[in-house]
Amino acid sequence: MPTITLPDGSQRSFDHSVSVAEVAASIGAGLAKATVAGKVDGKLVDASDLITNDASLQIITPKDQEGLEIIRHSCAHLIGHAVKQLYPTAKMVIGPVIDEGFYYDIAYERPFTPDDMAAIEQRMHALIEKDYDVIKKVTPRAEVIDVFTARGEDYKLRLVEDMPDEQAMGLYYHEEYVDMCRGPHVPNTRFLKSFKLTKLSGAYWRGDAKNEQLQRIYGTAWADKKQLAAYIQRIEEAEKRDHRKIGKRLNLFHLQEEAPGMVFWHPNGWTLYQVLEQYMRKVQRENGYLEIKTPQVVDRSLWEKSGHWANYADNMFTTQSENRDYAIKPMNCPCHVQVFNQGLKSYRELPMRLAEFGACHRNEPSGALHGIMRVRGFTQDDAHIFCTEEQMQAESAAFIKLTMDVYRDFGFTEVEMKLSTRPEKRVGSDELWDRAEAALAAALDSAGLAYDLQPGEGAFYGPKIEFSLKDCLGRVWQCGTLQLDFNLPIRLGAEYVSEDNSRKHPVMLHRAILGSFERFVGILIEHYEGAFPAWLAPTQAVIMNITDKQADFAAEVEKTLNESGFRAKSDLRNEKIGFKIREHTLLKVPYLLVIGDREVEMQTVAVRTREGADLGSMPVAQFAEFLAQAVSRRGRPDSE
């Protein structure tokens, strides 16, 4: 009979096979009521599952991350229950958990509307109020097929076909509704009260645009109403910061159907973009990078040699000319190897750091495009470091330091790092992987940085570090990458003459800090809600006159500031000064300079910030010095 060992080391013995729920009840009524599932010897199981042998057990409640994910998964099944009651001819497809929520894909004869979504949510709440138990039945394969055949659930039958080795499957019953899943799921609908459906979208069966289109209902679920309310507030704040809305309001860019996934930069947005590029150019030059420029359209033969044609062709834009196939480059690395290959290099010339603001194009599915965050045409702050094995650690450490400095300049102080190590299928010897992984780990350790280890998540050609920024809303954006590559230099014939006069292949470090410029601008827009630090603001100061009598001096101040290297504009319109101040405050201009008769007489400007602070009157030279200090701080706090 089983003896159950709990996380605190205490043990409970039973004279019969015992369910997770029974163990919880033996500990206390409160825990029994809160039990969502269990973890038996490290494996998640349903609360109703029996434990027949000695085992360790952790009771899973809504306070646990696993409990929250189970609640979300069960909410997806609840969508199915509600949809089948309201729209009996709908066909249910799949309903997985995603980050902070869930969705269900459904085939139906017409598009769902917001009114439909409201009706589905209302029905889900009504079902929850019935407080019914969710029943799990492990069912033989043939019976599963009979169940879904009788219900006309064609997609479920296709999913069963995808699992030929499964002789028994878990069926979960929500009253008359049944769904197929490995589980676990909540034992009762009382756990599902704190949910909300969030949006509708299209999807394709198996994610393939060639297949039939489905409808996707998204939702979120939390452990309690307080967590749900906090999430909704965060989402509302994120919507306020939507880079597409702010981009239009601040006249930064636009997108249009004739060029899907391609950005039309307006003067304000292009100014911001150029500030980023000029900053990165300066940083890279100061850190020993050599800037290059490579072609955008390259013959198929190079992509075949690099392996991209075989593995990436569906994502490449291609064209033909004079019976030759070409691809618009989706990435820069093969072209950078071509630059390295011009003339045999000596070990004395390594490391060689080649950088390019490389324009790339990828044929992303139209449904995946999102503003300037997910586009088809983009530019990367891309660079490749060609070095010896002995130089891997030093180059990695230097890059990590540079990356952290850059992020601080943009105002990001919380950075998450992941170190991904060797997968099962890989090139290169175990000894080489040992050295490469040790080099990246040592580089992170030497910088005093914490990181998450991702075993088996590296590319087949080398381990990597990913850098993810946390913005003001706590959202995480993966931006920087440091990827070691043992494969591409061999495939493309990159060699150098080593110290012993033999020829060796260099190690290639793919690296980016910002990633896509377009996406990084989108992140900045949302992080700052368009109120960029002075060094990034498209217009750093606007000069406004009160009456026409001050127009000449206002124009003179504008000229002085622009000649001093700042981005200043004057607003000489015949409008009330309050109107002008409000307009430029909404346009997020950092500094508003007001000129009246007194300022003309004293040769000063009255300075206000966009936040409404009155900095008083000061000579133009003093303001220029003040602005220069603000610009030099970049995005770092005043204390740094």
Curated annotation (Swiss-Prot):
| Domain TGS: start-end pairs | 1-61
Q: Which CDD domains match?
A: TGS_ThrRS, ThrRS_anticodon, ThrRS_core
Q: Which EC numbers does the record give?
A: 6.1.1.3
SMART domains of this UniProt entry? tRNA_SAD
Single GO molecular function:
ATP binding
Asked if the record carries the keyword Nucleotide-binding, the reply is yes
> What's the catalysed reaction?
tRNA(Thr) + L-threonine + ATP = L-threonyl-tRNA(Thr) + AMP + diphosphate + H(+)
Question: Gene Ontology cellular component?
Answer: cytosol
Indicate which residues the UniProt annotation says bind Zn(2+). Answer: 333, 384, 510
Q: Which InterPro entries match?
A: aa-tRNA-synt_IIb, aa-tRNA-synth_II, aa-tRNA-synth_II/BPL/LPL, Anticodon-bd, Anticodon-bd_dom_sf, Beta-grasp_dom_sf, TGS, TGS-like
Tell me which NCBIfam families the record gives. thrS
Tell me which PANTHER family the record gives: THREONINE--TRNA LIGASE, CHLOROPLASTIC_MITOCHONDRIAL 2, THREONINE-TRNA LIGASE
Protein function: Catalyzes the attachment of threonine to tRNA(Thr) in a two-step reaction: L-threonine is first activated by ATP to form Thr-AMP and then transferred to the acceptor end of tRNA(Thr). Also edits incorrectly charged L-seryl-tRNA(Thr).
Indicate what this protein is called per its UniProt record. Threonine--tRNA ligase
The record lists the organism as Pseudomonas fluorescens (strain SBW25)
User: Organism classification, top ranks?
Assistant: Bacteria, Pseudomonadati, Pseudomonadota, Gammaproteobacteria, Pseudomonadales
